[in-house]
């Protein structure tokens, strides 16, 4: 079944480039940039991946991202991910990148962007992997900080398909960012946002009504609100669900409890994604395979999930 799932044409719509930084590349970049790491070797770092919640993961994620310093570093990070896409027949990807993770460390916005977009361009010409880049604001920072990031992005407007919202969800509702999302839409950006991962269904309502998003990232807690579920079904609003991430971060205690197939059978346009695959133990095919192993996902369900991902692209072929 793994090989069949791997060969299935699919899109990935929820992937943080910084979260695809594998331990081996992290150590290689640290050596290249002469950065001391708190882990002795790759295995010690892998053991550190036993986090219990979103915040513990984010602390490690931001520490790991510190090795990314130069345009070449960002190119190498993105290229390594695109090679995985090619291996797993991900024919289209819409990755997030978090400028603030890097600009707050003194890395110039244009340095980060040049490395990422250079790799995405080569991914199209050399690997046949299409893409659309999403600029994501960090919700644990202020809306004013997000406004500054949007200002930095505007000279490179054509590099992006959308803006998004990620990082620590609890205590940082979508309403906190209504102004900057209004402005981004006026500048021609499409909009997406993380909502309903750790946060309540109310955050999904806010993302839809205040941020006017085209797609919900995560959204698994929508199932707790029947009126919200009906709206998502009626309007066919896509959800970019990340099963391995959800179990690793204890959104669900184990994969057998995940609700993605229940949502699929109710008519929700759910998709399968890897989120931060270096940290969560698998890329897209591994996520599909986990659904087959633990939830009994059928070939028909897998085809529908893959087709949903292709239908939910912001960048249309």
UniProtKB/Swiss-Prot annotation:
Binds 1 zinc ion per subunit. It is an enzyme of class 3 (hydrolase). Its EC number is 3.5.4.2. GO terms for molecular function: adenine deaminase activity; zinc ion binding. The record marks 218 as: Important for catalytic activity. It comes from the Bacteria. The active site is at 197 (proton donor). One of its GO terms (cellular component) is cytosol. GO terms for biological process: adenine catabolic process; hypoxanthine salvage; nucleotide metabolic process. SUPFAM superfamilies: Metallo-dependent hydrolases. Substrate binds at residue 276. InterPro entries: A_deaminase_dom, ADE, Ado/ade_deaminase, Metal_Hydrolase. Its cofactor is Zn(2+). Zn(2+) binds at residues 14, 16, 194, 275. It catalyses: adenine + H2O + H(+) = hypoxanthine + NH4(+). Keywords: Hydrolase, Metal-binding, Nucleotide metabolism, Zinc. Catalyzes the hydrolytic deamination of adenine to hypoxanthine. Plays an important role in the purine salvage pathway and in nitrogen catabolism. Belongs to the metallo-dependent hydrolases superfamily. Adenosine and AMP deaminases family. Adenine deaminase type 2 subfamily. This is Adenine deaminase. It comes from Pseudomonas syringae pv. tomato (strain ATCC BAA-871 / DC3000).
